[in-house]
Amino acid sequence: MQIHSFSLKNIGQFQDLSVSLAPAQDYPSNITVFIGNNGSGKTSLLKSVATALTWFVARLKHDKSNGTPIPESVILNTANAAAVEIIVNDQNLQQQIQAYTWRITKNRTARKAEFSTYLSELNQLTDYYKQWLGDDDQSSLPLIAFYPVERSVIDIPLKIREKHQFLQIDGYDNALNNAVDFR
């Protein structure tokens, strides 16, 4: 799975922003770099992508689970609603590259909905991964991690007293939030 692009509507200081990630048709590089002054919105971009990806992780674990909602505090001051849309490319069951799109939205309290949430392609994508894992429990899952500036370490055990077994899906625990636990 590779993020192709994402768009923000009324998030932070961005009223309407679309970002394509490398590699793009005009730029064959494999790296995307965000450069800007303090307060220019780099973290808003990354947090928005992380918020959208929490829905992938949640739906991969349980069919109807919700990811992290868009916080009302990040909605543009002059707007009543916000949306984050993400497009990822991945193989489908026929081993063909396919684009999957999903959109999450947030309305200010007691305000009319401006955008609609769209999750059907996300559900298709997570269903494919569930089927792959069901067929072969050693199937690869996408690597997803987010390390914000304020990420903190909750607990580091000095001695590991027992041997633990982990499922691949457990790797997503705390991968997109601000804390890490080494237990």
Language-model segments: residues:
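P-loop NTPase switch/coupling surface
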Residues: M1-R183
